[in-house]
UniProtKB/Swiss-Prot annotation:
Keywords: Calcium, Calcium channel, Calcium transport, Glycoprotein, Ion channel, Ion transport, Membrane, Plant defense, Repeat, Transmembrane, Transmembrane helix, Transport, Voltage-gated channel
Written domain comment of the UniProt record: Each of the two internal repeats contains five hydrophobic transmembrane segments (S1, S2, S3, S5, S6) and one positively charged transmembrane segment (S4). S4 segments probably represent the voltage-sensor and are characterized by a series of positively charged amino acids.
Domain of life: Eukaryota
Keyword Ion transport: yes
Membrane topology listed for this record: Multi-pass membrane protein
Name of the protein in question: Two pore calcium channel protein 1B
GO-annotated molecular function: calcium ion binding; voltage-gated calcium channel activity
Species classification: Eukaryota, Viridiplantae, Streptophyta, Embryophyta, Tracheophyta
Gene name of this polypeptide: TPC1B
Intramembrane residue segments, as ranges: 249-263, 619-633
Gene Ontology biological-process entries: calcium ion transport; defense response
Role this protein plays: Functions as a voltage-gated inward-rectifying Ca(2+) channel (VDCC) across the plasma membrane that mediates sucrose-induced Ca(2+) influx in autotrophically grown leaf cells. Acts as the major ROS-responsive Ca(2+) channel and is the possible target of Al-dependent inhibition. Plays a regulatory role in defense responses.
Length: 735
């Protein structure tokens, strides 16, 4: 299916080839290496989507700045963990309404229908906030050391982070010093800022919100047109049904009619809302059918089309900006090699670059004749030299066609043992297909065992105990599999694969959980009850989905599904952050209203539908409630009930705005993106099956673009394929 840069030789063929000497760290290469070592490291950085500010690349203190930059990035895991902790704090923080003088303490969870997550005490919360704030300050301000204050402050993003950091510090100080009784409406800005910092420092999330900000004007315009349609339809319905049973019972005023017609626009109260009119005359259904058809199948889809068109325009700008950043980094690498400053590289210079790139990518050993054929193929102008554009194509081909070089396993410290004949034979077996077939067989047997154990459990059969022990044995078999793979590949190389990360986490949770289940006292019901282990075992067997990749008719669909998951993560993360914002707002507006002692609660639809657990009294419950509203399951129940409990129609603004942002905007955006991304993936799969019939230009395009290795590269390639015509126009407009 793939056509390799070297005829008849795959990049994977030399994956196990060991090189003499140590692998050069690109941090050291940029800071202290030769011109070719620096250029190779910059090429690797560019293909990984990492870029240094352009002013640093062109500055005299480039090496020192790069050294500080890479020292900073060594702690990326710590920074990411801290931002995750900021969001997690919202889930465990005690709600502000609990600090008021209440007739019943909020420690009475049943009284307030609270969730099961424990609240942090005041001291614990303060320590948590203090530690995360300290790490946040270091992460935000450290870039000044390698960018310099002037360059750092020139960035709008950096200025925004510093301003928000000062606001967060002020919020914490005020919260500590002022008593809770000072607030008429308990309010803190910290829960919102934590999510904002999470967004600003996760690049994919930040890019998604920047795209949404760019298309906000277009979205508001189309929403305004939809509002005119709703206002006119509601007025028409109010006048038309004024003297009917519908007007006397449901459309009693224009405001009520507008509310009911808006809910009907979402189809949540269809056909309940127009049953009175239907009882009077069956012909009245024509009005409502026409309204639903126009609203749902025309206006909503019109919004979808306009929103997605605006989204693509903003996405093109963002992808083009990333391409320009990558090109600037490659331009710096090109200038390091082009010592004569004539804008061209000859064959010898490219050969030296390939040798240095071997330290970062897995490349076959290239003979002189082989390299000449590669050089001639990449030399589009035919002048036996490569310019910057051709150099960028070369780097793209390397980045897409070849995998990252494996790091040396820790076991290399004992070479006599690790490279003994027995060890080499074992590692060869683990790398082979036979070992994978054995694991698949174990998974299938495990699946049968789970089915039998589940069936016996449902039947309350005593034989279930035996099969639980069998499942326990399977858990340790997976540990052995994991240990063998770590021994063979090294942990860093093992962890690089997404499936291995999933297996590693689930396997250890299963084993620790099963062990705890067997040794825990019976009075600890949650630990001694092994029911939850079964679901983890079922999750472990999701690996069987990959078997479908070997079935021709399913391969394209499964491959597309696996590629779409990382493509969608930024947009799903955007919805999660919107839920966080609205959850914090919901806690501060509606917190504590739903409780057993509220006399108005029994008359609401929340009580009538047994929805009392879905409330805004704590963060976990609030997130679940917003999810229910997001999927439009009787969402008007919460809107109307909280309006009755608060006694103000301003409650509608909270729920209507959530609908406009999350459902009408973001969910429609995701649906449209999935449709186009799926079509793009199917096109790529079809083109891959037609290699033999393609012309030379198409082959060259695939040579430069297919075969992505990492998740980010797959997503980047998919976006470039989806937006190829728009990106071409953009590049023509901005030469």
């Amino acid at each position: 299916m793939e056509e390799y840069l070297l005829p008849g030789e795959s990049s994977n063929s030399c994956r196990t080839r060991r090189r003499s000497g140590s692998i050069f760290d690109r941090r050291d290469a940029i800071a202290h290496g030769s011109a070719y070592q620096k250029a190779a490291a910059l090429v690797d950085l560019a293909e990984d989507g990492i870029g240094l500010p352009e002013e640093i690349l062109e500055g005299a203190s480039f090496e020192k700045a790069a050294e500080l930059y890479f020292m900073f990035t060594r702690f990326d895991f710590l920074w990411s963990l801290n931002y995750l902790a900021l969001v997690v704090l919202n889930f465990f923080e005690k709600p502000l309404w609990c600090s008021k003088h209440l007739a019943e303490s909020c420690n009475n969870r049943d009284y307030y229908y609270l969730g099961e997550l424990p609240f942090l005490t005041g001291a614990e919360s303060l320590i948590f906030e203090g530690v995360t704030l300290l790490l946040l300050i270091i992460h935000i301000l450290f870039p000044i050391s390698y960018e310099g204050f002037n360059l750092y402050w020139r960035s709008l993003l950096n200025r925004l982070k510093v301003i928000l950091l000062l606001i967060l510090v002020a919020d914490i100080v005020v919260y500590i010093l002022l008593p809770a009784d000072f607030y008429y409406l308990p309010f803190r800005i910290a829960p919102y800022l934590r999510v904002v910092f999470f967004i600003l420092n996760i690049r994919e999330l930040r890019d998604s919100f920047f795209i949404l900000a760019g298309m906000l004007g277009t979205y508001l315009n189309v929403v305004a047109l939809s509002a005119l349609f709703l206002l006119f339809s509601s007025w028409l319905a109010y006048v038309f049904f004024e003297d009917t049973r519908q007007g006397k019972t449901t459309f009693t005023s224009y405001g009520t009619t507008l509310y009911q017609m808006f809910v009907l626009f979402t189809t949540s109260n269809n056909p309940d809302v127009w049953i009175p009119a239907y009882k009077d005359s069956r012909w009245y259904c024509l009005f409502f059918v026409l309204y639903v058809l126009l609203g749902v199948y025309f206006v909503t889809n019109l919004i979808l089309a306009v929103v997605y068109d605006s989204f693509k325009s903003e996405l093109v700008k963002q992808v083009a900006d990333k391409d320009r950043l990558r090109l600037r980094t490659l331009k710096k690498a090109f200038s390091l090699i082009d010592e004569a400053n004539n804008g061209l590289l000859n064959e010898k210079q490219c050969t030296l670059l390939f040798e240095e790139l071997n330290k970062y990518r897995t490349l076959p050993k290239i003979s002189g004749d082989d390299f000449k054929s590669i050089f001639n193929e990449l030399d589009d102008t035919g002048d036996f030299k490569i310019n910057l554009e051709e150099f960028a194509d070369l780097c793209s081909a390397i980045g897409l066609r070849f995998q990252k070089e494996d790091s040396l396993p820790i076991f290399e410290a004992c070479p006599n043992f690790y490279h003994s004949p027995a060890s080499e034979k074992l590692r060869g077996f683990i790398r082979g297909a036979t070992f994978e077939y054995i694991i698949v067989f174990v998974l299938l047997v495990n699946l049968v065992a789970v089915i039998i154990e589940t069936t016996l459990d449902i039947q309350n059969n005593s034989g279930q105990t035996f099969w639980q022990k069998v499942e326990f044995t399977f858990g340790w078999l997976y540990v052995i599999e994991m240990a063998l793979k770590v021994y063979t590949y090294g942990f860093e190389n093992y962890w690089r694969d997404g499936q291995n990360r999933f297996d590693f986490i689930v396997t250890w949770v299963i084993v620790i959980g099963e062990t705890t289940t067997f040794v825990a006292p019976d009075d600890l019901t949650f630990l001694s009850n092994g029911e939850w282990i079964r679901y983890l075992l079922i999750a472990r067997m999701l690996r069987l989905i990959r078997l479908l990749m070997h079935v021709e008719r399913y391969r394209a669909f499964v491959a597309t599904f696996l590629t779409l998951i990382p493509s969608l993560m930024p947009y799903l993360g955007t919805i999660f952050c919107i839920l966080c914002f609205y959850c914090s707002l919901g806690l501060q507006i509606f917190g504590g209203i739903v409780n057993t002692g509220n006399p108005n609660l029994a008359q609401t639809d929340l009580a009538g539908n047994d929805y009392l657990l879905f409330n805004f009294n704590d963060y976990p419950n609030g997130m679940v409630t917003l999810f229910n509203i997001l999927v439009m399951g009787n969402w008007q129940v919460w809107m109307q009930s909280y309006k009755e409990l608060t006694g103000t129609s301003w409650t509608y603004a909270y729920f209507v705005s959530f609908y406009l942002i999350s459902v009408l905007w973001l969910l429609n955006l995701i649906v449209a993106f999935v449709l186009e991304a799926f079509q793009a993936e199917m096109d790529l799969e079809a083109s891959a099956r037609c290699v033999d019939g393609d012309d030379k230009e198409a082959k060259r395009e695939r040579r430069r673009n297919v075969g992505t290795k990492t998740r980010s590269q797959r997503v980047d390639f998919l976006l470039h394929h989806m937006l190829r015509s728009e990106l071409t126009e953009c590049s023509n407009d901005n030469p």
